[in-house]
Design a protein with these regions (language model features):
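Conserved beta-strand signature within the Rossmann-like core of class I S-adenosyl-L-methionine
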Residues: 196-204
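Class I SAM-dependent methyltransferase SAM/SAH-binding core
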Residues: 93, 99-166
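Class I SAM-dependent methyltransferase Rossmann-like catalytic core
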Residues: 52-75
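N-terminal auxiliary segments of SAM/dcSAM-dependent transferases
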Residues: 1-53
Length: 291
């Protein structure tokens, strides 16, 4: 884990900022200590938490293969543009990040305006400073995914954390918060996002992967309304863009897009897939804090 990211992370026990203590170990001022994995990531889970299902190695591998072939490039470009336009200081926080693919693309486009320190949410610009590159944090419940995310980008740190609980991130640390096909925790999002920050949410629309309906979980037609209801009144909708494109998928591609998400748990391992022309339909929306 990068040392300059640690102050952006919070102890899951007492919520104090983390740092290097006791000869290099990661910990907080109240004496709570956390082991850093050899891959470089941290596990910051609350002591008591609900039993949740995390992505399996098979799901993570399928996602890396599928995204690595560029099939969701329109989403990557849209998120990169949002991050590149961000003006608030702070990190790019990808919640439910998986292996960090979207975060890595976003960081390649990200610079902090006016030379402000890349990770400090409340620092002022040094005299004569120039823009520097953003830092990022990938957060996911899956240790398998986070091990991959720790290697996704040189300017990214990776944390195993529970999206449904208090996020192990200090108040106002995020300039941009990415939520791509992930569960949402609007109370925590409002807490960790900078007052001038942006929340970017990607949700599937009706018709997304429709040609694979027999093998994938269907999209709730009320999903957009439920998104709006879940984020207000803490957030105000700033923009919404519908993206639709056609993907020419090989049999392996179809296997991977089915198995990289929740449908993995509902499809037999020996299912044989055929090449297919498949529609992708998502909404990319941005939201700003109302506080």
């Amino acid at each position: 884990m990068r040392d300059d990211l640690l102050p952006m992370l919070a102890c899951p026990v007492c919520a104090e900022p983390l740092g290097r203590v006791d000869g290099g170990q990661v910990g907080c001022p109240n004496g709570h200590r956390f082991d850093e994995a050899k891959q470089g990531h941290l596990t910051l889970l609350p002591a008591k938490r609900r039993a949740l299902t995390a992505d399996t190695p098979e799901m993570v591998d399928a996602r890396l293969r599928f995204l690595g072939r560029g099939h969701y490039a329109p989403v990557e470009r849209a998120l990169a543009a949002i991050v590149a336009d961000a003006t608030a200081p702070g990190v790019v926080l990808d919640v439910g990040s998986g292996p960090g693919t979207y975060l890595a693309h976003a960081l390649d486009a990200a610079h902090v305006p006016d030379g402000r320190p890349v990770a400090a949410p409340d620092a002022s610009a040094p005299a004569g400073g120039r823009p520097g590159p953003r830092l990022g944090v990938a957060l996911d419940l899956s240790a398998v995914a986070i091990r991959r995310a720790a290697r996704a980008h040189a300017r990214a740190g990776a944390v195993v954390g529970d999206v449904t609980e208090r996020l192990p991130v200090v108040d106002g640390a995020a300039a941009v918060l990415l939520d791509v096909f992930a569960p949402r925790n609007q109370t925590e999002y409002a807490r960790v996002l900078h007052a001038d920050g942006v929340l970017a949410v990607v949700t599937p629309r009706t018709g997304h992967l429709a040609e694979l309906a027999e093998a994938t979980i269907s999209v709730d037609p009320e999903k957009e309304r439920r998104l709006h209801d879940s984020l207000t009144p803490s957030f105000a909708l700033r923009s919404s863009e519908d993206l639709t494109w056609t993907m020419e998928l090989s049999a392996e591609d179809v296997h991977d897009v089915v198995h990289m998400g929740p449908s993995h748990h509902h499809v037999a391992a020996d299912t044989v897939f055929e090449p297919a022309t498949v529609t992708a339909a998502v909404t990319v929306s941005t939201w700003t804090p109302t506080r």
